[in-house]
Amino acid sequence: MDKFPSVLLVTKTTGYQARSFGDAAAKLGVRLIFATDRCDHLEDPWRDHAIPVRFHDESYSVRTIFNELKRTPPAGVLAVGDRPMHLAASVTQVFGLQGNTVEAVGISRNKLATRQALKAAELPVPWFRAVSVDSDIVTL
């Protein structure tokens, strides 16, 4: 078992924010593990020891992450971006960690669904109504 807790960061290789997370993790004494959409045919092209994932193939990616981390599971999972967020929710579920559910992530990616969920939970939400893109703007 590692001396320091680890956190999995699911992100795109092009995400500039990843380095900021790395700096923060180092300051906190947390081992940051990357899961990125880097090329899985080259040997660690970014030299970050990232687990290669495919955002378009979630079941493959969840399996890959699980197989890589099952001996020393992460203490938490973070995500940067829409597609990484969905994968992170699935990984969180597989490891039995607390975090956003896949359903909640799906809702958060849709403004109407988000507002409906907030309203159903009796939380403050601005007035809204759903309209078709074909609606006559004058009659609205």
What are these language model-derived features?
Residues N110-L140:
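Active-site nucleotide/adenylate-binding loops and adjacent lid/helix of ATP-dependent enzymes
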Residues M1-A104, S132-S135:
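ATP-binding N-terminal substructure of ATP-dependent carboxylate-amine bond-forming enzymes
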